[in-house]
């Protein structure tokens, strides 16, 4: 019971209308000195702007018919609540020696909970079609520590699409971990010029085994299934194109 007396005394002192606990040291050190100290404390616990560069996946995807190099990463700058985020994803075909896809997103990211950010901005596809899109999405951590990144995209031609990625980190040791990953695409309408049908369009399901050489760098190997779904699968099948493949991947994750 004696251990609780100091806390009760502080509560009683504060409740009598005297100086708040936050400002009690002003009487000893002076209000000006303590105000500066409080500003430093607040700065380092939420007001300080920081930045980061993260390469989620830089990998070689080796399939039966084609080898592709994939880059998936982002850069951000800001504080705990608001950030500027630039995301990029690019696919380069080693067989055709050309970029098959290049997209860049510039987003404002605002924290709506300790674990989720709402994001809004623009996306531009440099390849394959040069279209721009408005973006509205969510990124963060779901219950049971699933990392999620999902968004709706409205193109300049009025087409509405969406995509979501889920990833989970299963630690085997302090450095060795397994990364199951899934991705799903969706379209509100048929987009014939892009070979996309209404409904769920494509999916990916893979697993990677990674090892943290240092905390900022982790090479990995893995396997991933990639396939078209629904009406998109029918469109591609009718055109004589492959609708699914399994690829082996080798690459790394890094951040700074």
Predicted segment positions?
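Outer-membrane beta-barrel initiation region
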Residues: 8-98, 102, 106-110, 248
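Hydrophobic, lipid-facing positions within transmembrane beta-strands of outer-membrane proteins
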Residues: 51, 69-73, 102-106, 132-136, ...
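Transmembrane beta-barrel strands of outer-membrane/channel proteins
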Residues: 57-60, 86-90, 120-124, 150-154, ...
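Solvent-exposed loop/turn segments connecting transmembrane beta-strands
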Residues: 61-69, 91-102, 123-134, 152-163, ...
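Residue-level signature of outer-membrane beta-barrel architecture
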Residues: 77-79, 110, 124, 140, ...
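Repeated loop/turn-to-beta-strand initiation elements of outer-membrane beta-barrel proteins
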Residues: 81-86, 114-118, 144-148, 173-178, ...
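Detector for outer-membrane/organellar transmembrane beta-barrel domains
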Residues: 131-192
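Outer-membrane beta-barrel "beta-signal"
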Residues: 207-212, 242-256
